Amino acid sequence: MIHTSKHAANIVAVRPGVERLTAINSKTFKDEVVALIEDGASHLIIDFSEVSFLDSSGLGALTGVLKRIGHRGDLVVSGLNGDVTQMFKICRMDRVFKSYPDVGAAVQAMSENL
């Protein structure tokens, strides 16, 4: 389901691989990202540039991943479109997750903080 790309300093960008992250696929998404963390990934960028819709289950999966990574690393989001941004704001997730316009900006910011 997910697609990954590795960047410098153990930074991994993750694309969910779906247009809609919902109750139907959020558990699979979470399980696959948690497996990356268990394999040693500690700085993750979730790239939502291809995701047009996100429901509460998708947000729940994302917060579950954040809880799993804990203080061992960092989790940020990038590429949020208007609807996904609105969902983040309504649920106040914009206060929880750092957001960047694209993966490149997220990689640069994370690299500077390592």
Residues covered by each model-derived region:
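A charged, well-structured terminal subsegment
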Residues: 98-114
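Amphipathic alpha-helical interaction surfaces in cytosolic regulatory modules
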Residues: 20-97
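Residues that form or immediately flank small-molecule/cofactor binding pockets and catalytic motifs
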Residues: 9, 82, 104
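Generic signature of intrinsically disordered, low-complexity, basic-rich segments
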Residues: 4, 53, 101-105
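Non-catalytic signal-transmission and effector/linker regions of two-component phosphorelay proteins
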Residues: 1-7, 111-114
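STAS-typified acidic loop motif
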Residues: 3-31
